[in-house]
Amino acid sequence: MLPIPAFLGAKSPAMTIFRKPTLKISEKKKREMPEGLWTKCTGCSEMVHNLALEENLRVCPRCGHHFAMGAAERITLLIDEGSFRETDASMSAVDPLGFKGVATYEERLATYRKKTGLVDAVITGSGSMGGIPVGLAVMDFAFLAATMGSVVGEKITRIIEASTKAKRPVIIVCASGGARMYEGMLSLMQMAKTSGALARHAEAGLPYIAVLTNPTTAGVMASFATLGDITLAEPRAMIGFAGPRVIRETTHQELPAGFQTAEFLLEHGLIDEIVPRAKMRETIITIIRNLTGK
């Protein structure tokens, strides 16, 4: 057997020249992205910095998707600074049916009051827009999907009646999942009550402007949301009575593209105008001036 050359030996010093250096894995922890700084846009799936979102009135700066906006934020956006006076702020719901499920109605109310800081799903009051006195109701979807129960219906009815008495226009910003099932028939009664108040408001020759936001559905859509003298909507808002899945299963038919969107309703004459959030205040002020001559 031929001898193995020394430079090929396992212990040859020459072999150290050709050795692959050992890679050391860093012991440093991965950088974690701080929570609460970014939001994924449901319109374009891009990550949007929360600061940019707030500065843009909760509208995606990339695709224009309108995120949900709280009632207090909308009031600040629409009403002249310092002019808003809330009405019936402490009115709260009771549990007339003693509703029990996974959680009782009272437990759900307590949870959402703590979560949102609201007493119920609507804030009502009076203020001015462009110096013109108005009555205002703004629904907040974050509170039990802004379902309409006895408190929501009563507060909206009261601000309509107060505005009729004071001869003021009424603006209602709508967003709702419908009637509040926890209150049974009492919630359905609010459809007729609010509609009746608006009929008396119209008989007095006073304007009502409805602003439909995403989503406006079911009992609210079938009552005061669609009774406006002028009906405005935010872009791409879902507006309809039953959901698309329920309609498909009931009719066994495919729905048209864009069905139940603000754009579809505008095309078919069911709303008057689609208004981006940034232009909503000036649009409403212009409409009020034209309708009242003020």
Segments predicted by a language model, with ranges:
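N-terminal amphipathic/basic-hydrophobic helices that include classical n-h-c signal peptides
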Residues: 1-15
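Conserved, well-structured core domains of diverse proteins
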Residues: 15-30, 34
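An N-cap/entry alpha-helix motif that binds or orients negatively charged groups
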Residues: 24-28, 39-40, 67-124
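Residues immediately within or flanking Cys/His clusters that coordinate Zn2+
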Residues: 38, 57
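Short cysteine-rich clusters marking metal-coordination/redox-active sites
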Residues: 41-44, 60-63
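Cys/His-rich microdomains that often coordinate metals
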Residues: 47-48, 66-67
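Cleft-lining beta-strand/loop regions that shape enzyme active-site pockets
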Residues: 120-202, 209
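Conserved catalytic cores of soluble enzyme domains
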Residues: 174-292
